[in-house]
Amino acid sequence: YQTKNQGCDPSEYLSQKWAFSIVDKCIVLEDDDVPSQSFFPFCKEMLDRYEHDERIAMISGFNEDEVTPDCEDSYFFTSTFAIWGWASWRRVVDKWEGDYAFLRDKQAMKRLQSLVRQRGYRKDFLPMCTEHQQSGKEYYESIFWASMLLNSGLAIMPSKNLVNNLGLSDNSTHFCGSIQTTPKAYRRIFTMKRHELEFPLKHPKYVVENVDFKERVYKINAWGHPFIKMSRSLEELFLNLRYGNFSSIFKAMARRCRKMIGRDKHA
């Protein structure tokens, strides 16, 4: 345990670096993650099966499809993932750059910018990494994402969702608002059903990305979809007005103003 309360960040980064310095592979659950029972044997089998496959960077438990319609196997591969219940190996965590060194590498940044643009990934990702680096803290989410991109890593995704996240409330660390004022598409993410996988697992024959899944996830999160993002913002505004949640409206307006003047690059 930490001897000093350092907050969510950099505590998560430090804790995970510590854990993976002791073991070669590990399952990670945060306090707001609720896994199904089959999450653990699934992770165990994947950790053993792909331990030495450098193409695979992590195993995710949260599937935004809930049940992926175009998958006949027990799992598939994707370049997008969630950290709501995951597992990985020391070989992956050892590549994490806690000092965000890639930001000072002109060639790496040029290729990252091209990759983010080509994939239609969230435009605020690299500015967010810069802001995290300037804070002097290690934010493991942006460090993990950057490492996946820089090393062309794939995630293993179960064909059915195995994890719920309970982290949406007025007092959340990462999210503001409540279920009733959250746009329907995002609300679904936090109320999604957990499933159990059947064993023995059915393994895919090829290690190839499920691009259709990635495109659905990007659409759900409005990455590269400005009109969807705008409609979600309007829906959230309407819901906050409907339920009299004026404080959230003022906070959102303040974030937008900070973004406009360059004080918050990824609001």
What are the residue ranges of the model-derived segments?
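Peripheral/terminal regions associated with large enzymatic or DNA-binding modules
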Residues: 1-29, 33-267
